Amino acid sequence: MTEQSIKDGQRPELPPFTLRNVLNDIYNGILALFTDPFCTRIICPVVIVLTSLLSKAIIYKVPYTEIDFRTYIQQIQIINDGELDYSLVQGDTGQIVYPAGFVQIYQVLNWLTDEGTDIHAGQTAFGYLLALTNFLVIIAYTMTPDFQPWPVYCLLLSKRLFSIYVLRLFNDCFTTVCMVSVTILLQQAAYWYKKGGSSISFLLTMVAADLYSIAISIKMNALLYFPGFIIVAYFLCGENLLKFGTVLLVIPIVQVLMGWKFLLPFFNDEEASYIRWNYINQAFNFNRKFLYKWTVNWRFVSEEFFLSDVFSNGLLIANASVLIFFIFTRYISPRITCKPVSRLIKDAMVGPFSSTINKNNLLIDPKCGPKLVMLILGSTNIIGILFARSLHYQFLSWYCWQLPFMLYMTGWSLLVCIPLWVVHEWCWNVFPSTPMSSGLLVSILAIVLFGVWYNTNEWFPKLADNEAATIDESGESKKDK
């Protein structure tokens, strides 16, 4: 039937009602639930509800496993009794090693669980925390235009992740929800830079810095995001060093406020200095050693090599090298910033208190910016995970929420991404870890990072109105040549 006949009100001709056509419709419907961006809005609320229901089912069916929660509560009770010296705050499994944000969160959990006696209340709270986290993750995902549904399903498929939340009650979960929120705030800042003005973007970036510092005060793994955070924040401040410095200043100020009772900033006597030093030394200890028996990612190296300084320093150098490579080939590429690196440096030195950002910078483009924020923060974090000194089982929560997105950003087929996800999940469910599970885990993370880096279509999409066509590789305008 012609288009004109449809406009005239006539019913379109339907395909014949046959078994083959019915099966074909069913197949297309199922395929759409995985690949049609329109279906993303349908399945998102379903996934959030299922997260909550699965958490409740696991709490009901699977016995709780005590690992560190009792120790956390014991430490909080000592602090609640008035102890400020971190060296004297300890529980069954050791001394307190987390900053003051951890203390404040677990003080609430101490009250909620009636000093640790009502574990079910704590499990329920963590179940809702997981549902909230997935809700926020979906918001972050769907700020990428035409986002397919299949990565959202992956949020339901990690047995280990559900265990970390509702059967272990680790503090890592709170850092994660903070970092997802930071990501959303920066995505919103990128989206509104042109639509709502740079002032709105600056305020959102300030709030993101506040929340980022809170995440660090819960657990220091949030520092893995720092290189990506400062790059994104710099551009969202319009390359204005005054605004950028203000954003960075928020981070230490929040740390001081969070740890006020342990830092004792208005006291300079010997006892106050001792308490202050013990807090800083234990809460922000970068020299902490890890036990080989708990490593998930380096079981394929010998224990002697694992514990050596050579291995530790090698990982640090590798981390820095890969990160620098990503920074110069992707994060601040002229194809994103629309100006060469030399011009970025010159603008920062010549006009530090003015906005020098190129209007075509992809990070402030409403369509491209939110996706690039997710890409930069996600790749920065996973680079840190790949070269981490050691990963323990609860550390999966640090990046599990980003992995489906990163797989999607490789541009690979669903038939490649899903098997990679399944094998990755298997690696985290092998206990104790084996050389094979560790080797596969490291390999998958490296492969995903390479795939994300290699897929230039996601990093350097064609700009609307062909604006990108006027910018060459050096960042200079072709029209000016």
From Swiss-Prot:
Q: What is its EC class?
A: transferase
Q: Which family does it belong to?
A: Belongs to the glycosyltransferase ALG3 family.
Gene Ontology cellular component terms for the protein in this record: endoplasmic reticulum membrane
Q: What does this protein do?
A: Dol-P-Man:Man(5)GlcNAc(2)-PP-Dol alpha-1,3-mannosyltransferase that operates in the biosynthetic pathway of dolichol-linked oligosaccharides, the glycan precursors employed in protein asparagine (N)-glycosylation. The assembly of dolichol-linked oligosaccharides begins on the cytosolic side of the endoplasmic reticulum membrane and finishes in its lumen. The sequential addition of sugars to dolichol pyrophosphate produces dolichol-linked oligosaccharides containing fourteen sugars, including two GlcNAcs, nine mannoses and three glucoses.
The pathway this protein participates in, as annotated, is:
Protein modification; protein glycosylation
Q: Which GO terms describe its molecular function?
A: dol-P-Man:Man(5)GlcNAc(2)-PP-Dol alpha-1,3-mannosyltransferase activity
Pfam (any one): ALG3
Q: Keyword annotations for this protein?
A: Endoplasmic reticulum, Glycosyltransferase, Membrane, Transferase, Transmembrane, Transmembrane helix
Q: Please indicate the ranges of residues that lie on the Cytoplasmic side.
A: 63-124, 194-197, 243-246, 330-367, 424-433
Q: Which residues lie on this side of the membrane: Lumenal?
A: 1-41, 146-172, 219-221, 268-308, 389-402, 455-481
Where are the disulfide bridges?
A: none
Report the transmembrane regions from the record: 42-62, 125-145, 173-193, 198-218, 222-242, 247-267, 309-329, 368-388, 403-423, 434-454
Q: Which GO terms describe its biological process?
A: dolichol-linked oligosaccharide biosynthetic process
Protein name listed in UniProt = Dol-P-Man:Man(5)GlcNAc(2)-PP-Dol alpha-1,3-mannosyltransferase
> Does the entry feature the keyword Glycosyltransferase, yes or no?
yes
Show the coiled coil region(s). Answer: none
Species of origin? Debaryomyces hansenii (strain ATCC 36239 / CBS 767 / BCRC 21394 / JCM 1990 / NBRC 0083 / IGC 2968)
Q: Which reaction does it catalyse?
A: an alpha-D-Man-(1->2)-alpha-D-Man-(1->2)-alpha-D-Man-(1->3)-[alpha-D-Man-(1->6)]-beta-D-Man-(1->4)-beta-D-GlcNAc-(1->4)-alpha-D-GlcNAc-diphospho-di-trans,poly-cis-dolichol + a di-trans,poly-cis-dolichyl beta-D-mannosyl phosphate = an alpha-D-Man-(1->2)-alpha-D-Man-(1->2)-alpha-D-Man-(1->3)-[alpha-D-Man-(1->3)-alpha-D-Man-(1->6)]-beta-D-Man-(1->4)-beta-D-GlcNAc-(1->4)-alpha-D-GlcNAc-diphospho-di-trans,poly-cis-dolichol + a di-trans,poly-cis-dolichyl phosphate + H(+)
